C-alpha cells in the first residue's frame, strides 16, 4: 500500500461568527484509526471536510500523504443507475477491486441506487471507499443507518484496512467497537 497519513496543525473552524473548534492538531499514520467524537453539531463533519481539503480551515494547516477516499452524507453514487453501474463508475476511475460481497450488496446490484434503504446506501458508500484503493479513509458517521450486524462488519473492514497499512479517520457521535482506536473529543477544542 502506498504511503498514507495526514498532519493537521492548529486547525480552527468558523461557521458564521461562531468558532466551532480551535487549536486542534492531529497526526494520523499508517495503521491508525482515529475517532473524532462529539455530539451532533459540534463540528465533526466540518473537520472531516477540512481534512479532505473540501473546506478551508479558519486557521491552521493540513498536510496529506497518499490518496484519500471520503464517505460523508453525500452518497457519491448516481441514484438513477443500478447499484452495479454506479459502483463501476468509481471502479473505472480508481481501478481497484469490487468488494460488493464484503458489504452484502450482491443481491442489490440490479436495484437503482435511489431505491436502496438508508443502511444499504451506507454499505454501498463504504464499498465505494473500500474499492477506491486509497490508503487514507475519511468517514463521516459511517455507522449511521446500519444494524448491529452490518455495523460490526463495517468496523471489521476498517480494522482490516488498517492492518494492511491503511489509515482511517472516523467522525461519529456513536461509540465504536474497534480494538485499535484513538479518540479525539472535539469538545476539548471548543473556545
Swiss-Prot record:
Residues 6-189 form the ABC transporter domain. It catalyses: heme b(in) + ATP + H2O = heme b(out) + ADP + phosphate + H(+). PROSITE patterns: ABC_TRANSPORTER_2 (PS50893), CCMA (PS51243). InterPro entries: AAA+_ATPase (IPR003593), ABC_transporter-like_ATP-bd (IPR003439), ABC_transptr_haem_export_CcmA (IPR005895), P-loop_NTPase (IPR027417). The complex is composed of two ATP-binding proteins (CcmA) and two transmembrane proteins (CcmB). Part of the ABC transporter complex CcmAB involved in the biogenesis of c-type cytochromes; once thought to export heme, this seems not to be the case, but its exact role is uncertain. Responsible for energy coupling to the transport system. Belongs to the ABC transporter superfamily. CcmA exporter (TC 3.A.1.107) family. This is Cytochrome c biogenesis ATP-binding export protein CcmA. It comes from Novosphingobium aromaticivorans (strain ATCC 700278 / DSM 12444 / CCUG 56034 / CIP 105152 / NBRC 16084 / F199).
Amino acid at each position: 500500500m502506498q504511503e498514507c497519513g495526514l498532519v493537521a496543525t492548529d486547525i480552527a473552524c468558523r461557521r458564521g461568527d461562531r468558532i466551532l473548534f480551535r487549536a486542534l492538531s492531529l497526526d494520523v499514520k499508517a495503521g491508525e484509526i482515529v475517532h473524532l467524537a462529539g455530539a451532533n453539531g459540534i463540528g465533526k463533519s466540518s473537520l472531516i471536510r477540512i481534512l479532505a481539503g473540501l473546506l478551508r480551515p479558519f486557521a491552521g494547516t493540513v498536510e496529506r500523504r497518499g490518496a484519500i477516499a471520503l464517505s460523508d452524507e453525500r452518497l457519491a453514487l448516481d441514484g438513477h443507475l443500478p447499484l452495479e453501474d454506479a459502483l463501476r463508475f468509481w471502479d473505472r476511475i480508481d481501478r481497484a477491486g469490487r468488494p460488493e460481497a464484503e458489504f452484502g450488496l450482491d443481491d442489490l446490484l440490479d436495484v437503482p441506487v435511489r431505491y436502496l434503504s438508508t443502511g444499504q446506501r451506507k454499505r454501498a458508500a463504504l464499498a465505494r471507499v473500500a474499492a477506491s484503493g486509497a490508503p487514507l479513509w475519511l468517514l463521516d458517521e459511517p455507522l449511521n443507518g446500519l444494524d448491529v450486524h452490518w455495523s460490526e462488519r463495517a468496523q471489521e473492514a476498517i480494522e482490516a484496512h488498517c492492518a494492511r497499512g491503511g489509515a482511517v479517520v472516523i467522525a461519529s457521535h456513536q461509540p465504536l467497537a474497534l480494538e485499535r482506536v484513538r479518540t479525539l473529543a472535539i469538545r476539548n477544542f471548543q473556545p
